[in-house]
Amino acid sequence: MKSVQFCFLFCCWRAICCRSCELTNITITVEKEECGFCISINTTWCAGYCYTRDLVYRDPARPNIQKTCTFKELVYETVKVPGCAHHADSLYTYPVATECHCSKCDSDSTDCTVRGLGPSYCSFREIKE
């Protein structure tokens, strides 16, 4: 009986404490090579946990797909990068997530690597706005 109560309490704790896949505010650094500057902007992206499991053995009937928290819907916004030369295109377009879900990572539109450059990577000096 105690093990049943423990399992019930553990499941309740997990449901309350562990955040599911949801929209979250993040700051990313954007840069344009022609401009030589970086700026930090606030945007919305997906973060959280998705239920997944690894099979101990390979089963051809059931492929092993790791689910990740990723966007379901997104829109694009544009910002002007200051300090660009007059002949350079100073507009930078970036994605903003509007809806999230747990799904297989789509490497055509998402960086699915374990360790990418990160949202604050900048090759140039940063302009504080």
From Swiss-Prot:
The subunit structure is: Heterodimer. The active follitropin is a heterodimer composed of an alpha chain/CGA shared with other hormones and a unique beta chain/FSHB shown here.
Which UniProt keywords are present, listed alphabetically?
Disulfide bond, Glycoprotein, Hormone, Secreted, Signal
Show the GO cellular component annotation of the record.
cytoplasm; extracellular space; follicle-stimulating hormone complex
InterPro entries, per this entry?
Answer: Cystine-knot_cytokine, Glyco_hormone_CN, Gonadotropin_bsu, Gonadotropin_bsu_CS
Whether Glycoprotein counts among this entry's keywords is yes
Q: Which cysteines are joined by disulfide bonds?
A: C21-C69, C35-C84, C38-C122, C46-C100, C50-C102, C105-C112
In its UniProt record, which GO terms are filed under biological process? Answer: follicle-stimulating hormone signaling pathway; G protein-coupled receptor signaling pathway; positive regulation of bone resorption; positive regulation of gene expression; positive regulation of steroid biosynthetic process; regulation of osteoclast differentiation; regulation of signaling receptor activity; Sertoli cell proliferation
What one GO molecular function would you report for this record?
A: follicle-stimulating hormone activity
Q: Which domain of life is it from?
A: Eukaryota
Specify the species.
Answer: Bos taurus
**Member of which family?**
Belongs to the glycoprotein hormones subunit beta family.
Signal peptide, first to last residue: 1-20
Glycosylation, residue list: N25, N42
Kindly give the SUPFAM superfamilies that the UniProt entry links to this protein.
Cystine-knot cytokines (SSF57501)
Principal location: secreted
Q: Where in the cell is it found?
A: Secreted
**Stated role:** Together with the alpha chain CGA constitutes follitropin, the follicle-stimulating hormone, and provides its biological specificity to the hormone heterodimer. Binds FSHR, a G protein-coupled receptor, on target cells to activate downstream signaling pathways. Follitropin is involved in follicle development and spermatogenesis in reproductive organs.
- The name this protein carries in UniProt is Follitropin subunit beta
